[in-house]
Each structure stands twice: as structure tokens, then as C-alpha cells.
Regions:
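Conserved alpha-helical scaffold flanking the Walker A/P-loop in AAA+ ATPase domains
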Residues: 41-44, 97-117, 146
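Walker A/P-loop
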Residues: 46-83
Length: 331
């Protein structure tokens, strides 16, 4: 009984603490037509301190989305265009000699921002990708002999173009695993497309004004960590991830020869974190199975390795996650 009272109190507190989410979503909706899944993914990454890898063709509002979010939170935004000639110093910063001061000074790179858009991350060599991914992991960078902490909150949204694969440097599996979510962005619907045309040829873009602060986001993160996850939900998360490793144990023998490797414990951790953030966005103090299912594809699609047999049969990690979710027993 005491637990029920605790959850009720937590629900009330989370409803109060998550009020700003409504303002953020309505602010995003004023600027971005459709792309609700992209907006939700950005909020999940922001509230659970995770980074996002986006895959979609150019022109689907990826840049506009993260820029608008940074403006709504009154924080710093930067965009890094990854190219084959980019150097790690172009991302994290370097030491430059000042003739006036007659000494070397630190010039901080574009990674020193709250929201960083790493555009076409697979266009730059591995050493540049590693520089950014290390900064994402450590939340700090070393320039010369000095170490600098990155701003807080710090959210990286990296993009990849799924069509153009020539002259690219695919991210290694170990690096991709550092992204909490991999989100596939689709085209807008017909009605959304008409609205986009109308808004872009008839008027100016809506003016974006801050609706919350970075400090409020940091407070919200601590509340998200209090969202209740029942032991049965923990078991459900563990079962889903285990089914990516040992599908035959869950009545999915046909998937055994399709998966070369499954999700690591990082997948379980991120699935729980993302489900908590999703519950918070829905203004609930506890996680339900639907929250786990809602984020499972984005958390797992880049953490499942496919065999040659799967690729030859045109089976995707997307389909594998769907089969697992439909088969694993829901509490």
C-alpha cells in the first residue's frame, strides 16, 4: 500500500516537473511540421543524457529541429559539417599562437556547445569521428596539456545520409554503440507536405523564444531518474535484450542464423533510461510495457549485427526487433 502512495506522490510531482515539456513540444510544433518521432527522440535524448544518430535523406528538418530545441532552451548550438579534410582540431579546438600576447592560447572548437549537430558524420575519417565520440563519452576534451569540461546539458545529434555511401567512412560498431538512439527519419505525409509548402512560400518562419532553461533541464534529468520501474518491467527489458543474443530461448529459432551479435548490457541500460524518459514525456511517474516498446526500435536497431545470410535475405535489424517485441512475453 505504501508503494502505491509513493507512486501517486511521484505521479503528482512528475506532472508538475514535466509541465515544461508541453511548452517545448508546442514550440517545436510551431516551427516543424510533423516529424513527431524526431521531436520525441530529441526530448528522450535530452532528458536521459544520451546522444542520437539520425538517418534520413537531406531536407527532413534535422538541422532545424535541433536548432529550434536549443533556442527554446536558451542554450548554445553549433553545427559541424563533416568532410574528408576535417581534422580533430576542427572539432575539439587547438592551441594558436597570439602575437599580441606572445604565447599560445586555447581556441575552443564547435564541440563546446549544449547542442551539437554533427552533420554527415560518416564523411570524415575515423580519427575525427573518434575525437567527437570521445568527447561524447567523457564529457570533456583535452587541448594541449589542458582538460576542459563540456557544457551541461550536452547533446550530440549526428546525421547520416543512407543514400550516398561513396567516399564515406562508416562508423565502427563499437562507436555506433555509444549513441543511445538511432532514429530513422521518414518523409512527411501528404497533408504535412502541403502545410510545409504553404508556410514556406507565404510567410516568415515563426519566431522562437525560450520557454525553459538549461538548469531546468538538469533538474528534470534528476526527476527522470526517479521514474519508477517495476521489477517485472526490468525483467521485460532484460528479456528483450537477451532475445537479441539467444533468440532460440524465446521461440525464435529462425533468427539464430540471422544475428551475428546481439545487444550489450549498454542496450539494457539505454532501454531502461529511454523508457523512463518516455514515461516522463507522457507525464507519468512509472514505466509501462508500452514505453519500452515505443523506444525499443531506436535503442536496438544499431546494436544488432546481421549475418551474411540475413543480408542476402534482405532481413533488417528493424524486422528482427519487431519479431522480438512481438514474441517476448509482456508483463
Amino acid at each position: 500500500m505504501a508503494e502505491a502512495i509513493d507512486i501517486r506522490e511521484l505521479n503528482i510531482r512528475i506532472e508538475q516537473q514535466s509541465a515544461f515539456v508541453t511548452n517545448l513540444v508546442s514550440g517545436m510544433d510551431r516551427v516543424i511540421v510533423g516529424q513527431k518521432h524526431l521531436v520525441d527522440s530529441l526530448l528522450i535524448g535530452l532528458l536521459s543524457d544520451g546522444h542520437i544518430l539520425l538517418e534520413g535523406v537531406p531536407g527532413l528538418a534535422k538541422t532545424l529541429a535541433i536548432k529550434t530545441l536549443s533556442q527554446l532552451i536558451d542554450s548554445k548550438y553549433s553545427r559541424i559539417q563533416f568532410t574528408p579534410d576535417l581534422l580533430p582540431a576542427d572539432v575539439i579546438g587547438t592551441m594558436i599562437y597570439s602575437q599580441k600576447e606572445e604565447k599560445f592560447q586555447v581556441k575552443m572548437g564547435p564541440v563546446f556547445a549544449n547542442f551539437v549537430l554533427a552533420d554527415e558524420i560518416n564523411r570524415a575519417p575515423a580519427k575525427v569521428q573518434s575525437a567527437l565520440l570521445e568527447a561524447m563519452q567523457e564529457k570533456q576534451v583535452t587541448i594541449g596539456s589542458q582538460t576542459f569540461s563540456l557544457p551541461n546539458p550536452f547533446l550530440v545529434m549526428a546525421t547520416q545520409n543512407p543514400i550516398e555511401q561513396e567516399d564515406t567512412y562508416p562508423l565502427p560498431e563499437a562507436q555506433v554503440d555509444r549513441f543511445m538512439l538511432k532514429v530513422i527519419i521518414d518523409y512527411p505525409s501528404l497533408d504535412e507536405e502541403k502545410k510545409i509548402i504553404r508556410e514556406n512560400i507565404t510567410g516568415e518562419m515563426p519566431k522562437v523564444t525560450p520557454v525553459t532553461t538549461a538548469d531546468e533541464i538538469l533538474k528534470a534529468r534528476s526527476v527522470v531518474r526517479e521514474v519508477y520501474i517495476d521489477e517485472k518491467i526490468e525483467q521485460y527489458i532484460a528479456d528483450i535484450v537477451f532475445a537479441t543474443r539467444y533468440p532460440e530461448r524465446y521461440g525464435l529459432k529462425d533468427l539464430k542464423d540471422m544475428i551475428s551479435f546481439g545487444g550489450s548490457p549498454r542496450a539494457s541500460i539505454n532501454l531502461a533510461k529511454a523508457a523512463r524518459a518516455y514515461a516522463f514525456i507522457k507525464r507519468r511517474g512509472y514505466v509501462v510495457p508500452e514505453d519500452v516498446r515505443a523506444v525499443a526500435h531506436d535503442v536496438l536497431r544499431h546494436r544488432i549485427g546481421l549475418t551474411y545470410e540475413a543480408e542476402a535475405s534482405n532481413i533488417t535489424s528493424e524486422e528482427i526487433v519487431s519479431k522480438i517485441i512481438n514474441k517476448v512475453e509482456v508483463p
